[in-house]
Regions:
Chain A
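Conserved ABC transporter NBD signature motif
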Residues: 59-67, 74-75
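Short, charged/small-residue-rich alpha-helical element at the C-terminal edge
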Residues: 216-283
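Conserved ABC ATPase "signature" region
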Residues: 99, 103, 108-124
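ABC ATPase "signature
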Residues: 211-212
Length: 283, 249
């Protein structure tokens, strides 16, 4: 499989503040890759360097075979960008906005096809000013898609959405997988990364704290937890062999004629992995 | 060229749909023209009929409102909204975009000039401007100089909310000091010194000279030079300070 994005030892500082301190990763063509991390972890800086908006201080970056800092119009034909804030002309209709931006590309998708893809058929001829926040965000995605790019950058595509709008956006993004697009998305929502991404890199203070498939990340971490209450106190056991430990526990409890109150067996969620990776180290 | 036509078509559509621009840059100068024209259009100002004098003043008002104020505010709003940033991620070349935007401004101002002259002729019996070629060239020179100043100014304005405040603080005093609505001779001397530095003063004198003084544009090299210098100052600042992404922090 060919590589769409290669980042190697990327560094960027703003004055004294080092926003990105040696980040390396690769994204294969057709992959959905997530950059996950809290605010200020360096996600947007990294993405904006890949989009060609910012100059890097050190490291090498190749996006679709070119250095974004020196990219030309032909390169821009192949990328689509959804920025954190949806910026569009408030007095144009949905269809006009798509036609305007589509006109910048050699081989745009048809307006109606994109309208359907983002599920705004009912709003096709409404002006942007009258759209809801979620509808604007979907048009945002449409504007990034109308040039039929190979690579899409989505910077926090669902921040500020209500749960229903997020699910709709997820469906739109998932449907792009079928089109064979490579996607780099940033998010601080774990469920979003878990749901959408093939692979995830967790950024923390400008470095990659962990990287892998969402399942691998959870697998690499703390073992299974068994919790129950005894004499009003909570007992927490961690084990690599949950089956055996659970068997021993229940046998003993049965023999004693006791109930294991509030018994719970759980694997760590990506959330806990994430928190353990991104939490400030305590003194 | 295809991209330029595409962008120009949409810029004109965006312009025509903007109520703010329609009112502040198009209607307000006309309203003031009519009001002042009925108030002292029959007096004599600077050796011509008051309404004829006001016609030139209104063209000056139009050029700062459309080419300077309107353009500055549109660019700052688009920049701070992130629209310019989004455009940078598309294959639309920056020069094509800016040329289309400036052409739109120029077209809007020339339409406005036609309307101002038509109102002057029908409401106050003004005569059709003589030396049409020099007249149009003077309007274009003025619009270009003020557009350059406007683009330059965008680089110095940090926030969207600041744009109209800064623009108004510059252009209303300039409008009055340049003598667009009253004769400058009646001002105290220090204000006349300020007026002598303002680009609008030279635009007014140039157009006045072409329309009522029997001059061609090349008979007034001092006015042309002053406008050109101001335009170059604007262009110089624009090249150094113009930015595509929202001002941070």
């Amino acid at each position: 499989m060919s590589t769409a994005v290669t980042v190697s030892d990327l560094r960027k500082a703003y004055g004294e503040v080092e926003a990105v301190r040696g980040v390396s990763f690769e994204i294969a063509a057709g992959e959905i890759f997530g950059l996950l991390g809290p605010n200020g972890a360096g996600k947007t800086t990294t993405v904006e360097i890949l989009e060609g908006y910012r100059e890097r201080d050190a490291g090498s970056v190749t996006v679709l075979g070119a250095d974004p800092a020196r990219a030309d119009q032909r390169w821009r034909e192949q990328i689509g960008v959804v920025l954190q804030s949806s910026a569009m002309y408030p007095t144009l209709t949905v269809a006009e906005s798509l036609a305007l931006f589509g006109g910048y590309y050699e081989h745009p998708r048809s307006v109606d096809e994109v309208v359907q893809l983002i599920g705004l058929e009912q709003k096709r001829d409404s002006i942007v000013r009258k759209l809801s926040g979620g509808q604007r965000r979907r048009l945002d995605l449409g504007l990034a898609l109308v040039g039929d790019p190979d690579l899409l950058f989505l910077d926090e595509p669902t921040t500020g959405f209500d749960p229903q709008a997020r699910r709709r956006a997820w469906e739109s993004i998932s449907s792009l997988r079928a089109l064979g697009k490579t996607i780099l998305l940033t998010t601080h929502y774990l469920d979003e990364a878990e749901r959408l991404c093939d692979r995830v890199a967790v950024l923390r203070e400008g470095r990659i704290a962990a990287m892998g498939r969402p399942g691998e990340l959870t697998g690499a971490l703390p073992p299974t937890e068994i919790r129950y209450r005894q004499d009003g106190r909570e007992v927490v056991l961690r084990t690599e062999e949950p089956t055996r430990m659970l068997n021993e526990l229940t046998q003993k409890a049965l023999a004693d004629g006791r109930e294991l109150e509030a018994l719970e067996v759980r694997r760590p969620s990506l959330e806990e992995v994430y928190l353990s990776l991104t939490e400030e180290e305590k003194e | 060229m295809r991209l330029f036509r595409h962008e120009l078509r949409y810029e004109l559509r965006l312009y025509s749909r903007s109520r703010e621009l329609a009112f502040f840059t198009f209607l307000l100068p006309l309203i003031l023209f009519l009001m002042l024209g009925f108030a002292y259009g029959d007096d004599e100002l600077n050796g011509v009929k008051g309404s004829d004098y006001l016609l030139i003043g209104t063209l000056g008002y139009g050029v700062v409102a459309t080419a300077f104020a309107g353009l500055t505010i549109v660019i700052v709003l688009r920049r701070e909204d992130g629209i310019l940033k989004r455009l940078r991620s598309t294959p639309l070349p920056a020069p094509t975009y800016l040329t289309a935007l400036l052409t739109t401004t120029m077209i809007a101002f020339l339409i406005q000039a036609v309307v101002i002259v038509a109102v002057g002729m029908s409401a106050f019996g003004a005569s059709f401007p003589s030396h049409l070629f020099s007249f149009v060239l003077s309007l274009i020179l003025g619009a270009a100089a003020f557009a350059a100043l406007g683009v330059g100014l965008t680089g110095l304005v940090k926030r969207a909310e600041g744009a109209s405040a800064v623009v108004n603080a510059i252009y209303f005093p300039m409008l009055f000091l340049s003598g667009s609505f009253f004769e400058r001779d009646t001002f105290p001397e220090f204000l006349q010194v300020v007026a002598d530095a303002l680009p609008l003063t030279y635009f007014f004198d140039l157009v006045f000279g072409v329309v009522y003084g029997g001059d061609q544009i090349w008979d007034r090299p001092q006015d042309v030079a002053a406008l050109a210098i101001w335009g170059l100052v604007g262009a110089f600042v624009a090249v150094r300070k113009f930015h595509w992404t929202p001002t941070e922090g």
